[in-house]
Design a protein with these regions (language model features):
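Binding-interface segments
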Residues: 16-226
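Glycine- and charge-rich intrinsically disordered segments
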Residues: 1-27, 230-302
Length: 302
């Protein structure tokens, strides 16, 4: 018991601020970011000091930030590209707060457009009366644009679509009922027996945003062009990076924190895509997992 208390006290004394003062961390940040390293470090410190993240395990904050940096995506929740989100994850018999990297749906669109192969890409809500029919075999949707009785107060489904420059196009549609089943199946918080946990889930507070990301991720992971950046995003989305291995914390029995996204931005150059931080996964040396069946985005949907 005494050893456990001592270990907890030692962990509290280690912060992001103390870690980045070490020469090894400074050197790696400088190698990764060059002249932008000081700005990145300053932004990361601001993120680490947010009320929702200040008690999170510091290495998990750093590794999550580096994932966002390698993808050249800002982590301001108001922009909707990527997020650093705190979670209570069970380690042994204890719950420890760690930071988790999460993609936003705009981040997926951004990575897709960077390939230069997409002519059009979008994901939207579908309102009552908008659709005539859905072809289950091809995925094609026929919209009824002339229907004067379209009810834009009622969302009945979600659709994601892209068309490549070579002419290939694909559509994926999920009804609201299908999305509800999906959310309850893969989100521990949304399916929790505790009412306050359910209400705190973004599936409750921003169902449409969460659903848009889900259908877009399903489209891109199954039919899109999987660039190295896209593979990394899909693999690391909703994961805590432990020694280079993504750990999907929503697969554990845990209750997510109510307030779970920061509002700070980190801007990183697109060419800064390689790092030797042990917490970051090298996607070229690992098999890319099909993560669309992992629990969906528990940070803000936008």
């Amino acid at each position: 018991m005494a050893n456990q208390v001592q270990r907890q006290e030692q962990q509290r004394s280690i912060t992001v601020n103390t870690l980045i003062k070490q020469d090894s961390y400074k050197k790696r940040f400088n190698e990764l970011l060059g002249k932008k390293a000081p700005g990145f470090i300053s932004s990361m410190l601001n993120v680490a000091n947010l009320p929702t993240l200040k008690d999170a395990e510091p290495n998990s904050i750093i590794s999550s930030a580096v994932v966002a940096a390698t993808l050249d995506l800002p982590i301001d929740q108001n922009l909707g590209f990527a997020y650093i989100v705190p979670y209570n994850t069970k380690v042994g018999n204890e719950y420890i707060k760690k930071a988790q990297f999460q993609m936003g749906y705009k981040g997926y669109i951004q990575l897709a457009m960077r390939t230069g192969q997409y002519k059009t890409i979008n994901a939207i809500e579908v309102y009552e009366g908008e659709i005539k029919r859905v072809n289950r075999l091809t995925g094609e949707i026929e919209f009824d644009y002339d229907n004067e009785f379209i009810n834009r107060e009622i969302v009945v489904g979600y659709v994601a679509y892209f068309k490549l420059l070579n002419g290939f196009e694909k559509t994926v549609y999920m009804s609201k009922e299908e999305m509800e089943i999906h959310a309850k199946k893969y989100s521990q918080s949304y399916s929790s027996s505790k009412d306050w946990v359910v209400k705190g889930s973004l599936w409750s507070t921003d169902f449409d945003g969460m659903a848009i990301k889900t259908v877009l991720k399903r489209l891109l992971s199954k039919y899109g062009i999987l660039s190295i950046e896209m593979q990394s995003a899909i693999t690391n989305d909703q994961a805590v990076i432990n020694d280079g291995t993504p750990e999907y914390v929503d697969n554990q029995v845990r209750e997510e924190l109510l307030q779970n996204a920061n509002k700070k931005t980190i801007g990183i150059p697109v060419d800064a895509v390689e790092t030797e931080f042990k917490e970051v996964k090298d996607v070229e040396n690992n098999n890319i997992q099909e993560t669309i069946d992992q629990p969906m985005f528990e940070g803000p949907g936008f």
